[in-house]
Regions:
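PLP-dependent aminotransferase class I/II
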Residues: 8, 37-42, 47-54, 60, ...
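Helix C-cap/helix->beta junction micro-motif
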Residues: 99, 152-153, 306
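N-terminal "arm"/small-domain region of PLP-dependent enzymes with the aminotransferase-like
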Residues: 1-30, 35, 306
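Conserved coil-to-alpha-helix start sites within the AMP-binding
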Residues: 87-93
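Hydrophobic residues in well-ordered beta-strands that form the structural core
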Residues: 84, 105, 157-159, 202, ...
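Active-site phosphate-binding strand-loop segment of PLP-dependent enzymes
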Residues: 111-193, 199-201, 344
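Short beta-strand->loop structural element characteristic of the AMP-binding/adenylate-forming
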Residues: 102-112, 311
Length: 366
């Protein structure tokens, strides 16, 4: 079976460095809020060219903490609205509602599956305070029009950068496009930890200081709590692992691009709609390679029977989840269409040539 993503094989490439990093942490006797977290934060902010990076427990917390930070700073309050794509993983929406803010769903573009920026302005009200963009599947969601809308309406732009570390727009990396960005280092991400981890980047010093306290029980100084915070800290051992893997992220994203370009070049089946390649290849890091087909279940079973594992990102849109039953009667037809059709093919930095050839051959014979 060709795995959708072979995490063991990916991490095996760096096993000696990862084991050395683990031993270093064990021998140090310091497991939280130490030198390795500080080192990784510096490496991440330098990589993104951002002023600040704060390591946190996971990607959802990263987004939650950004919004909570703005609330503590008086920029947002209960009931304020945040525009968010209707076509996204539910974490993007949970971060908003968890802070007693109101998610306002906006449909995606068929071209990129990202938030349709041309539809944002119609969703803005007097209560709108931010736009939470998602660089879905690894493709940048950004434009001059987005910048102009945010400036015109005095809105914060928050990046959900869980899937697109290393992508660029006009020479600026994701994580440094908006006012703040949340990262996930879930093991399956392009930069994956060996457990849960996340981070926030921002050029706003006040927001950075506020988030750093909020993530540590609301405390700037031990036993003195300014906020009713939470416990969302990256472990030293995960920071050490991520410092090893960050060195290779650019090499790995180039391999992903080459596979995506090959799929687009060699898959020739009129029943399958392939993703668009961006004019500037740097705008996509191909966390996922997502095709569309009307008989998805049949194709997925066919691929499985022929030894190819695939996944669906995502089978149920947020507005159809039980968690948001208040949206049960809402209609977002583009999102629903995509969620019914999309199928993610294997793509990753350790795929063998014969695996890629096999997948292409099977799809062309379908």
């Amino acid at each position: 079976m060709i795995k959708f993503l072979d995490l063991q094989k990916i991490n095996e490439q760096y096993s000696q460095e990862l084991k050395a990093a683990a031993n270093d942490v064990i021998d140090s006797g310091w497991y939280l809020l130490g030198e390795r977290v500080n080192n990784f934060e510096n490496q991440l902010k330098n990589y993104c060219a951002s002023k600040n990076a704060i390591a946190v427990g996971n990607g959802l917390d990263a987004l939650r903490l950004i919004l909570r930070g703005y609330i503590e700073m008086g920029i947002m309050k209960t009931g304020d609205e945040v525009i968010v794509p209707s076509n996204t993983y539910i974490a993007s929406v949970l971060a908003i509602s968890d802070n007693n803010l109101k998610p306002i769903l906006v449909e995606p573009s068929y071209d990129s599956y990202n938030l349709d920026i041309s539809k944002i302005e119609a969703a803005i009200t007097k209560r709108t305070k931010a736009i939470l963009i998602v660089h879905l599947y690894g493709q940048v969601c950004w434009s001059k029009q987005l910048e102009e809308i945010a400036l015109k309406h005095n809105l914060k732009i928050i990046e959900d950068n869980a899937q697109a570390i290393g992508a660029e727009w006009n020479g600026i990396k994701t994580g440094n496009l908006g006012d703040a960005a949340g990262f996930s280092f879930y093991p399956g991400k392009n930069l994956g930890a060996l457990g849960d981890s996340g981070a926030v980047t921002t050029n706003d010093d006040e927001l950075s200081i506020t988030i750093r306290a909020l993530a540590n029980y609301g405390s700037h100084k031990k036993y003195k709590n300014k906020y009713q915070g939470l416990n969302s800290r990256m472990d030293e051992i995960q920071a050490a692992f991520l410092s090893v893997k960050l060195k290779y992220i650019d090499d790995e994203k180039q391999i992903r691009r080459q596979i995506a370009e090959r799929y687009n070049r060699e898959i020739k089946n009129d029943k399958i709609l392939l993703p668009n390649l961006p004019i500037n290849p740097k705008e996509h890091v191909w966390h996922l390679y997502v095709i569309r087909i009307k008989d998805r279940e049949n194709l997925q079973n066919y691929l499985s029977n022929n030894g190819v594992q695939t996944l669906i990102h995502y089978p149920i849109p947020p507005h159809k989840q039980d968690a948001y039953s208040e949206w049960a009667e809402s209609s977002y037809p583009i999102s629903e269409d995509l969620h019914n059709d999309v199928l993610s093919l294997p793509i990753g930095p350790v795929m063998e040539d014969d695996e890629i050839r096999k997948i292409i051959k099977i799809l062309n014979e379908y």
